[in-house]
Amino acid sequence: MPQKLILASTSPYRRELLSRLGLAFDVANPQTDESPIFGESPESMALRLSEAKARAAAQAYPDALIIGSDQVATVNGNIYGKPGTHERAVKQLRELSGKTVNFFTGLCLLNARTGEAEVRGIPTLVTFRELTDSEIDNYLRREPAYNCAGSAKSEGLGIALMSSMRGDDPNALVGLPLIALCDMLRKQSLGVL
């Protein structure tokens, strides 16, 4: 019997990206503590949390293939998470103005039946233009990116804040690296094509 595919995320962006592959899947809320561990690197945190989300969903889906993903944005070791409010988003964008940000996306595919997990990290470097307060305010009023690490949606109007982007998979920046995921699914005998 083929294994059910589960996306361990409540993110509408990840759900939309996964739906592009044309595979049937269900969504699970992973209920994971996303607090950083003292001394943990941002990259290690994203990898740990992507696997933790998949393993949390395995409690309800012990026979499934489960996808977990997590993303952190960093500049000089400082982590920029989801701002949550307009004021924090303004502060983040002021701090990121003119800087290159490392968006690191952790991806896990867990075979809950066997307990085996494959975990990968996909970096994307984004350079923000020098932003004026007026541009920041106009952007956030038109596209309140309060639930996005770094306060900008590259798949929307946020692209206007950026001067360059470097990475292997543009989907990684949105939160689900589809190139790596397709490879991982093939290894589990679930080909997309």
UniProtKB/Swiss-Prot annotation:
The record marks Y13, Q71, E155 as: Important for substrate specificity. Keywords: Cytoplasm, Hydrolase, Nucleotide metabolism. The keyword Cytoplasm applies. InterPro entries: ITPase-like_fam, Maf-like. Signal peptide: none annotated. Its EC number is 3.6.1.-. One of its GO terms (molecular function) is nucleoside triphosphate diphosphatase activity. Belongs to the Maf family. YceF subfamily. Nucleoside triphosphate pyrophosphatase that hydrolyzes 7-methyl-GTP (m(7)GTP). May have a dual role in cell division arrest and in preventing the incorporation of modified nucleotides into cellular nucleic acids. This is 7-methyl-GTP pyrophosphatase. It comes from Dechloromonas aromatica (strain RCB).
